[in-house]
């Protein structure tokens, strides 16, 4: 009898999966987000495959960082944004209780208000805004910027999250100041000694947005730089998950906002390098030589055991993407340290309108923690210490 019941339940599950595939497009259905074998939390978060070419990375989950991979091997991590937050008076109230509660997925201003309240600790009173500044700064027209932002907010509201690159945007040939306009779409993979992937630097914010958008050309999903609110949501996501594991709230908040030395590539950090290559910074000048992680240089910034040593001043090392497993949280590599990352957030400063976030590897982890907001002189060209990260949504 138990066996018969088990077979019945198996049949029901298979039928449910078949129906889901037909409805959600995993076997040629429509363009709605696909869910298939991805875990979810009812009423809170519903991860989806951007399209049928993605698959789940084995062994990953919502508790430790759910990862998917596209057909080219690029990997993305799900950022949870609980759908229940919009009904919480702590987040939906401005003057009277619930006056900022969204009425639908297109109630964009109220959705954004709630997300700002939810991430208030990481906004930290910033005057930066997710508003259009110029075509030259963002790589988008005003209409395109507004449309993109609304689509992001709508998707987050409906699905309870979004995807970001597991790794910093990467490229197979290291860029230098003398390189011309970048044209190659970014990767989101871990580099190795044999196949190094370098942080995609010497790009402007507008170029980074244009490059990122190439990943979804002709696709049914969108690819973009993150807006400022998305970066803050990534930090909040890490906070919530770490607290759920028993980490004290104060401890994780400090690691995200005050001092990220313990989990990022900074000059005052020490950690084991597991793969890839590195280049030495000396007095904020980056070497043109990239050394395998298991070898040393005359500077001895990395010892014979592949352990990065503590540096001072403006010395340090720049890593290829995903080089150290100690420089990650929730399966997201190098959110703290290595290179700063462009966002579509505006500083409203005519000389430096584009906000970038995170740390820099020849500086300390308390000066440039993961939370850090700063700016780049976008109009003057790219820098060796500023890159970007891809966001996917549907």
Residue ranges and their predicted role:
Residues 72-73, 104-334:
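Short aromatic-cysteine micro-motif
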Residues 202-210, 222, 226, 321-327, ...:
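Disulfide-stabilized, aromatic/cysteine-rich ligand-recognition loop
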Residues 1-31:
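A signal for long, low-complexity, Ser/Thr/Asn-enriched, surface-exposed stalk/shaft
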Residues 336-344:
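Active-site-proximal beta-strands of protease catalytic cores
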Residues 82-86, 168-171, 344-350, 361, ...:
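Acidic glycine-/aspartate-rich tracts in secreted/extracellular proteins
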Residues 29-89:
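GGW-centered surface loops in extracellular recognition modules
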Residues 85-95, 171-177, 364-368:
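Short, solvent-exposed loop/turn elements at domain surfaces
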